[in-house]
């Protein structure tokens, strides 16, 4: 007979809450800085307002009680969801009230999407351009119209009711946030029951969520889109409740519906292949993925996650224990392996958040690439403005998340890391050989930087000397990306063996025939050459530098040879005190600050590469004589020199935004100008010393005192850290808004 160890015993799922732990007090809530003893006394100097903003959401600084911190984070998540539902509701409301959605639905190839009409106050109505179908408004590039069509929405009334539903959900979220902090707040053990959490998130959110969406796609989206693709007037299409209740309508479109669920229980699942398909490629009518393929995908994903939702041990003594999995994971060269990591991930939400942000950010950038390589919604691929916007948006979101991962990993190291619990495990071993890691990474950055930039400088020099035969290019000295070409070719050929019934490979980027909708290229094979090889190595360089900065910030967050007691100074500090020169700008916060600039560098080049490559080699019109691309394939010839990037991309393509005045795109011209100003304004904070401003302020205060109009709250210059924060915020805001206006004015004009 075997007696199971205490660890083997299941962690019972139980509702563990404290009733009425914190009273609801509007008086307390209305008092600025109520969460801090110092701040709640009110302002003595202008630094107070900055500290208020810095610490309002830094729950660690309000209390050291992990349970209380967990409750605040949990409650704040509901507030965040409420705000998201309000935002989403606003999007749907604009679609219902101020858009040409129904007109677009009837002719998506000629009518452009618009859901914003500018009020005429002092002439702003110039922004309401003619988007077709007798509608004047601002052309939008969010992709909502394509998403709505894919969802099976056929009228503005449906958008209106969904918008109201969004507000109801927002109210429910705000109530839940209040209820789970003030009325029934979960105990710490509930937050730390990871097996139960994994089962619920995997099985419930991802499994049942995907199943519900697959059900919607099968019963509503597929029939509606099949009828729309066949040219049926949206007003003639049966409403969702007809499709759900009247099996005859569905059986007309998908014969297997007549058989009901018998094939499911008799395991004749292939009967359902009329609506759960495996075609591959794009629908030639809409230029989007086959919606029957995506429905099939969501059914498969649902099955996977419903299985995953039963993998972890809770009420019954079967399944995995996260702690056991981690601690059993021990390689021959890695000491204690993952021992101690379970404790870190259940007591440090910063560590948890760092991992999630890194994964989520990487996923966002992967999504950016899938949106053009495998456009998921009807008529998305031929809406070039939306394609460019979605790529840029998901790339930048990913970058911010990844820098956030570096930030929270460093905060974990400073605030939550306990060296006594981490002896010779993976984390300890990484920290002990951090010098080797960072110096190797530094060498890689130098190698990539000099070699990739060196290729460009060589080409610029040869070009200036009139020696094109000595340049690296597809027509002279070729540097073909042979591995990338091999991957493309393999992905193009493989489905013929692995999926013989598929019509095409997963994406047209691999190869095959071009798909055009309404005479515009939706997607076609993307050929890679010397120019792509060169800019790819610039991507490698900038990404490695970003990682170097963030990783150095994390690994040296607690101590360094320069400042052995860094952990005592905290996450952000300007210098190691007076009288110790050369120790400024070494805090973990400063590494995040620098990492943001390199993230911006990296991603600017990524989105520039995408924008130019697509205009040159993919996007364009199809005529009898072939494909006419927007910039006529000039990427391969011009993108191999720095001068080519400046002249044929930045300068040549900025003419639309610079000359937009007096047209419906004039707002982009003003934003372009204003955002340059915001960017330049940031330099005032980044290139200045705090003492200069303090001195200036004191002389101004002296003048006010002379006139007896001195303020009661003493003005103070921003601290070094505050100044850098304001600087980087404006640098990024200015840079992003400049790029946004440049891209949109260009692509709306020529796309």
Swiss-Prot record:
Please give the annotated consequence of changing residue 676 to C.
Answer: No PSI detected
Please indicate which superkingdom the organism of origin belongs to.
Eukaryota
Catalysed reaction(s) here are: reduced [plastocyanin] + hnu + oxidized [2Fe-2S]-[ferredoxin] = oxidized [plastocyanin] + reduced [2Fe-2S]-[ferredoxin]
Alphabetical GO CC annotations of the entry are: chloroplast thylakoid membrane; photosystem I
Task: Provide the binding site for chlorophyll a.
Answer: 684, 692
Q: What class of enzyme is it?
A: oxidoreductase
Please state where this protein is localized: Plastid, Chloroplast thylakoid membrane
Q: How does it sit in the membrane?
A: Multi-pass membrane protein
Where do the annotations place phylloquinone binding? 693
- For this UniProt record, give its keywords in alphabetical order, as a comma-separated list: 4Fe-4S, Chlorophyll, Chloroplast, Chromophore, Electron transport, Iron, Iron-sulfur, Magnesium, Membrane, Metal-binding, Oxidoreductase, Photosynthesis, Photosystem I, Plastid, Thylakoid, Transmembrane, Transmembrane helix, Transport
UniProt EC number: 1.97.1.12
The residues that cross the membrane are: 73-96, 159-182, 198-222, 294-312, 349-372, 388-414, 436-458, 533-551, 591-612, 665-687, 725-745
List, in alphabetical order, the GO biological process terms annotated in this UniProt record.
photosynthesis
The principal location of this protein is plastid
The record's family statement is: Belongs to the PsaA/PsaB family.
The subunit field of the Swiss-Prot or TrEMBL record says: The PsaA/B heterodimer binds the P700 chlorophyll special pair and subsequent electron acceptors. PSI consists of a core antenna complex that captures photons, and an electron transfer chain that converts photonic excitation into a charge separation. The eukaryotic PSI reaction center is composed of at least 11 subunits.
Protein known as? Photosystem I P700 chlorophyll a apoprotein A1
Originating organism: Chlamydomonas reinhardtii
């Amino acid at each position: 007979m075997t007696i199971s160890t205490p660890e083997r015993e299941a962690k019972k799922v139980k509702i563990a809450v404290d009733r009425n732990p914190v009273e609801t007090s509007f008086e307390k809530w209305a008092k600025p800085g109520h969460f801090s003893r110092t701040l709640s006394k009110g302002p003595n100097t202008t630094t107070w307002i900055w500290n208020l903003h810095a610490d309002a959401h830094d729950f660690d600084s309000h209390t050291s009680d992990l349970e209380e911190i967990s409750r605040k984070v949990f409650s704040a998540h509901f507030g965040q969801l409420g705000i998201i539902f309000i935002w989403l509701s606003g999007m749907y409301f604009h679609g219902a009230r101020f858009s040409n959605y129904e007109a677009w639905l009837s002719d998506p190839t000629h009518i452009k999407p618009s859901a914003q009409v500018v009020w005429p106050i002092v002439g702003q109505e110039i922004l309401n351009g003619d988007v077709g179908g007798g509608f004047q408004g601002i052309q939008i590039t969010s992709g909502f119209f394509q998403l709505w069509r894919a969802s099976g929405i056929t009228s503005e009334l449906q958008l209106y009711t969904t918008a109201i539903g969004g507000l109801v959900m927002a109210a429910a979220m705000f109530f839940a946030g209040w209820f789970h902090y003030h009325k029934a707040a979960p105990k710490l053990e509930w937050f730390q029951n990871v097996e139960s959490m994994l089962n619920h998130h995997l099985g419930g959110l991802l499994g049942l969520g995907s199943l519900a969406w697959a059900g919607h796609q099968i019963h509503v989206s597929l029939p509606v889109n099949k009828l729309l693709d066949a040219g049926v007037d949206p007003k003639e299409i049966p409403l969702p409740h007809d499709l759900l209740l009247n099996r005859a309508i569905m059986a007309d479109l998908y014969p297997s519906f007549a058989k009901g669920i018998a094939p499911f229980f008799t395991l004749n699942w292939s009967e359902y292949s009329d609506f759960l398909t495996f075609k591959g490629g794009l629908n030639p009518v809409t230029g989007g993925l086959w919606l029957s393929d995506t429905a099939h995908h969501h059914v498969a994903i649902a099955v996977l996650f419903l299985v995953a939702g039963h993998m972890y041990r809770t009420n019954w003594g079967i399944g995995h224990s996260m702690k056991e999995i981690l601690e059993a994971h021990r390689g021959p060269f890695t000491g204690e392996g993952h021992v101690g990591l379970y404790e870190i991930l259940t007591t440090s939400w910063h560590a948890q958040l760092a991992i999630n942000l890194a994964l989520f950010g990487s996923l966002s950038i992967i999504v950016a690439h899938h949106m053009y390589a495998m456009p998921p919604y009807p008529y998305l691929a031929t809406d070039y403005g939306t394609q460019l916007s979605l790529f840029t948006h998901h790339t930048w979101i990913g970058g911010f998340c990844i820098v956030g991962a570096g930030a929270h990993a460093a905060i974990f190291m400073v605030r939550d890391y306990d060296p006594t619990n981490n002896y010779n495990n993976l984390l300890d071993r990484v920290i002990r050989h951090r010098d080797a890691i960072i110096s190797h990474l530094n060498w890689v950055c130098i190698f990539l930087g000099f070699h990739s930039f060196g290729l460009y400088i060589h080409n610029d020099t040869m070009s200036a000397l009139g020696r094109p035969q000595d340049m690296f290019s597809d027509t002279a000295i070729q540097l073909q990306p042979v591995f990338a070409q091999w991957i493309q070719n393999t992905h193009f050929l493989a489905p013929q063996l692995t999926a013989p019934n598929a019509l095409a490979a997963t994406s047209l980027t691999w190869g095959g025939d071009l798909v055009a909708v309404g005479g515009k290229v939706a997607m076609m094979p993307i050929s890679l050459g010397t120019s792509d090889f060169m800019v790819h190595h610039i991507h490698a360089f900038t990404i490695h530098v970003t990682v170097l900065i963030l990783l150095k910030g994390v690994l040296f967050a607690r101590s360094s040879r320069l400042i052995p007691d860094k952990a005592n100074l905290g996450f952000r500090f300007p210098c190691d005190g007076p009288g110790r020169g050369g120790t400024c700008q070494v805090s973990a916060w400063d590494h995040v600050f620098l990492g943001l600039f390199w993230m911006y560098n990296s991603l600017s080049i990524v989105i520039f590469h995408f924008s130019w490559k697509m205009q040159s080699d993919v996007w364009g019109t199809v005529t009898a004589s072939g494909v006419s691309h927007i910039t006529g394939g000039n990427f391969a010839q011009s993108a191999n020199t720095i001068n080519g990037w400046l002249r044929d991309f930045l300068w040549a393509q900025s003419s639309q935004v610079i000359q937009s005045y007096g047209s419906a795109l004039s707002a982009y011209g003003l934003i372009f100008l204003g955002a340059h100003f915001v960017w330049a304004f940031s330099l005032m904070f980044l290139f200045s010393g705090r003492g200069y401003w303090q001195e200036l302020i004191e002389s101004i205060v002296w003048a006010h005192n002379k006139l007896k109009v001195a303020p009661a709250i003493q003005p103070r210059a921003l601290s070094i850290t505050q100044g850098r924060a304001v600087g980087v915020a404006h640098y990024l805001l200015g840079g992003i808004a400049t790029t946004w206006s440049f891209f949109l004015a260009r692509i709306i004009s020529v796309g």
